[in-house]
């Protein structure tokens, strides 16, 4: 995909109805992409087996995007080649009452993968800081003072 064709350069008014949103303009061949995806899924499965056998590290995939950007679909389709026994998916939504009793990284630490395993984070702790401030949850959520500082 050629990202430049979707980038607004700021030289004038931004008219969303005039911006191209269709990848067909880039000459993308869906059949080639599907074939490559199938090939990559097979490679991912083999790599996961080797990663598990090695057992020295854990691996985290972080998917960070706006709502309805396709994070769940990416997990469902792109990660479908992985063995589900070695993968844990965690969605970080607004902190619940239990999570509010701990520091802001507690729930992330809880979701870290074991050695040889893979964790997929739907959103990340970066957004966690933003959500807490946006919804004014700082009083009940233990965050480092430097995180709450404003410029």
PLM features per residue range, with description:
Residues 1-151:
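Glycine-rich phosphate-binding loop of ATP-dependent small-molecule kinases
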């Amino acid at each position: 995909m050629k990202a430049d064709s979707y980038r607004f350069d700021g030289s004038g008014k931004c008219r969303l109805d005039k911006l191209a949103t269709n990848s067909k303009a880039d000459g993308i061949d869906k059949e080639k992409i599907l074939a490559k995806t199938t090939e990559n899924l097979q490679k991912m499965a083999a790599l996961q087996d080797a990663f598990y056998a090695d057992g020295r590290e854990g691996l985290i995939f972080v998917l960070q995007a706006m709502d309805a950007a396709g994070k769940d679909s990416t997990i469902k389709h792109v990660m479908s080649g992985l063995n589900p026994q070695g993968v844990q998916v965690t969605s970080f939504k607004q902190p619940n009452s239990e999570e509010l009793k701990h520091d802001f990284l507690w729930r992330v630490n809880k979701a870290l993968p074991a050695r040889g395993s893979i964790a997929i984070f739907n959103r990340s702790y970066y957004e966690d800081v933003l959500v807490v401030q946006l919804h004014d949850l700082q009083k009940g959520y233990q965050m480092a003072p430097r995180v709450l500082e404003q410029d």
